[in-house]
């Protein structure tokens, strides 16, 4: 730090000397130019001559007395010369710097390192925003009314053997085929609207005994005590005509095998029971028309 001050003092002194030299040189140059530009006038009258000296009338000119002013080579007024004022200011600064240089420089105490407290980031707490109460959505259950399945009516007729001798498969299956019944789905026989077996089913024939099927490998080995005829309402075509055809087929097979026609309760068929079947069919037709 002290060496830097010495360097600044030396540089300041050189700058002041340069400014002084420049100022003196400029002043001399201005003085010479003023003296050289002045016109030559007549010589100064001797100082011992009286000022009221008369001249002859014949003189064609008058000697003009004028005091000659010697050129001033002195230093101009410092107040009007900016260079000199600057030099004075620099001199004052140099004197102050010299005085500061004489003052012993006390060693500066090293600043004690401050203990830096580690910054602990505080957890950001989310603003307490009141939560809107969510009203439970009331779901209105719409009762979908499923279409009610149409109630099926089943009309059943049975053909049972007359005694203890069961129906043998050979004669039974032969008689059934002759009356338009064909073996098909669910291992039972069906009567189709078309005798070729491609039309809609009008009624079907199953085994009266368990398990209800008429499945057989050899007709001669098959035997049963009876078969059941059944038709469902609604059915394909006219239900009354289908019932007449089913009743006629059952009576024909019973005649072929020597059996009896029974109702759904396995009782002998009577005219009153036949009327009850017909009435059941009529009532079904009325309900179907009103639906």
Swiss-Prot record:
Where composition is biased (Basic and acidic residues), the residues are: 29-51
For side Cytoplasmic, which residue ranges? 27-291
| Self-association and partners | Interacts with FtsZ via their C-terminal domains.
In residue numbers, the region (Disordered) covers: 29-61, 92-119
User: Matching InterPro entries, A to Z?
Assistant: Cell_div_ZipA, ZipA_FtsZ-bd_C, ZipA_FtsZ-bd_C_sf
Ranges facing Periplasmic side? 1-5
Which biological process annotations from GO are given for this protein? division septum assembly; FtsZ-dependent cytokinesis
- What family is this? Belongs to the ZipA family.
Annotated membrane topology is: Single-pass type I membrane protein
Keywords from the named record: Cell cycle, Cell division, Cell inner membrane, Cell membrane, Membrane, Transmembrane, Transmembrane helix
Q: What does this protein do?
A: Essential cell division protein that stabilizes the FtsZ protofilaments by cross-linking them and that serves as a cytoplasmic membrane anchor for the Z ring. Also required for the recruitment to the septal ring of downstream cell division proteins.
The encoding gene: zipA
Q: Does the keyword Ribosomal protein apply?
A: no
Give the UniProt subcellular location, in the record's own words: Cell inner membrane
| Name the record gives this protein | Cell division protein ZipA
Asked whether the keyword Oxidoreductase is assigned, the reply is: no
Q: Where are the transmembrane segments?
A: 6-26
């Amino acid at each position: 730090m002290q060496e830097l001050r010495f360097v600044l003092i030396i540089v300041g002194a050189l700058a002041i000397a340069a400014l002084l030299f420049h100022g003196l040189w400029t002043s001399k140059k201005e003085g010479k130019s003023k003296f050289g530009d002045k016109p030559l006038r007549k010589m100064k009258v001797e100082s011992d001559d009286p000022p009221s000296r008369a001249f002859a009338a014949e003189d064609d000119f008058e000697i003009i007395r004028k005091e000659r002013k010697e050129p001033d080579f002195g230093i101009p007024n410092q107040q009007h010369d900016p260079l000199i004022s600057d030099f004075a200011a620099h001199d004052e600064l140099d004197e102050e710097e010299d005085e500061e240089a004489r003052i012993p420089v006390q060693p500066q105490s090293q600043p004690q390192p401050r203990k830096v407290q580690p910054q602990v980031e505080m957890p950001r707490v989310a603003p307490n925003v009141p939560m809107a109460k969510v009203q439970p959505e009331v779901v209105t259950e719409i009762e979908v009314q499923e279409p009610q399945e149409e109630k099926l009516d089943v009309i059943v007729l049975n053909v049972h053997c007359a005694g203890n001798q069961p129906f043998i498969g050979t004669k039974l299956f032969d008689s059934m085929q002759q009356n338009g019944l064909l073996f098909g789905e669910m291992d039972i026989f069906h009567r189709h609207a078309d005798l070729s077996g491609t039309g809609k089913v009008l009624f079907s024939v199953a085994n009266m005994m368990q398990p209800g099927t008429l499945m057989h490998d050899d007709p001669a080995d098959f035997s049963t005590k009876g078969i059941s005829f059944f038709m469902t309402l609604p059915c394909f075509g006219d239900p009354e005509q289908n019932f007449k055809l089913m009743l006629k087929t059952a009576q024909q097979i019973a005649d072929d095998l020597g059996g009896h026609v029974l109702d759904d309760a396995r009782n002998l068929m009577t005219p009153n029971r036949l009327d009850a079947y017909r009435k059941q069919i009529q009532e079904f037709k009325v309900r179907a028309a009103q639906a």
